[in-house]
């Protein structure tokens, strides 16, 4: 049976993935003129925003001035072999909740998508949030993401002479590593 023109589906009938609706923080950033990408909220409904590494410090400072005064978590993950590395920052407006100005917690997660080629890097936010110190060091140690301007840019968990980044999906574990005994 040959298809006739009435049976063919037009390209207008094919569903197109809609862009996520910008959340309140994304809308505020738009009003302030900050370039970013609204991402889908996570499974708990937390707003997620994609930013370029170049704008990370400026957008982080803007969020801090807008009440996001606590860096709850910073970390990284690998999207898979040959894919991007992701560095994320989870901010919370803690003072508003403690002061009783709000009944619900405002939170937002920034994500910076990086190429795994070469030495992926982005600016440190240690100057804005001191709590980023060990979190950025752990992300460097496990994924090899360099944080420019970090005051203590060295490994946190692995020995200083360790080769590679253990939480990357393409990491190959060495057959043997001899550690010096402290005793």
From Swiss-Prot:
The protein, known as: NAD(P)H-quinone oxidoreductase subunit J
The reaction(s) this protein catalyses: a plastoquinone + NADH + (n+1) H(+)(in) = a plastoquinol + NAD(+) + n H(+)(out); a plastoquinone + NADPH + (n+1) H(+)(in) = a plastoquinol + NADP(+) + n H(+)(out)
Entry keywords, A to Z: Membrane, NAD, NADP, Plastoquinone, Quinone, Thylakoid, Translocase, Transport
Family named by the database record: Belongs to the complex I 30 kDa subunit family.
Name of the encoding gene: ndhJ
Biased composition annotated in UniProt, kind: Polar residues: 1-12
Keyword Cytoplasm: no
Molecular function per GO: NADH dehydrogenase (ubiquinone) activity; quinone binding
Keyword Calcium among UniProt keywords: no
EC number(s) reported in the record: 7.1.1.-
Top EC class of this enzyme: translocase
InterPro entries associated with the record: NADH_DH_suC (IPR010218), NADH_quin_OxRdtase_su_C/D-like (IPR037232), NADH_UbQ_OxRdtase_30kDa_su (IPR001268), NADH_UbQ_OxRdtase_CS (IPR020396)
Intracellular or extracellular location(s): Cellular thylakoid membrane
A GO cellular component entry from the record: plasma membrane-derived thylakoid membrane
PROSITE patterns documented for this protein: COMPLEX1_30K
Subunit structure: NDH-1 can be composed of about 15 different subunits; different subcomplexes with different compositions have been identified which probably have different functions.
Membrane topology designation: Peripheral membrane protein
Organism in which the protein naturally occurs: Synechococcus sp. (strain CC9311)
Residues covered by region (Disordered): 1-29
Known role: NDH-1 shuttles electrons from an unknown electron donor, via FMN and iron-sulfur (Fe-S) centers, to quinones in the respiratory and/or the photosynthetic chain. The immediate electron acceptor for the enzyme in this species is believed to be plastoquinone. Couples the redox reaction to proton translocation, and thus conserves the redox energy in a proton gradient. Cyanobacterial NDH-1 also plays a role in inorganic carbon-concentration.
Chief place of localization: membrane
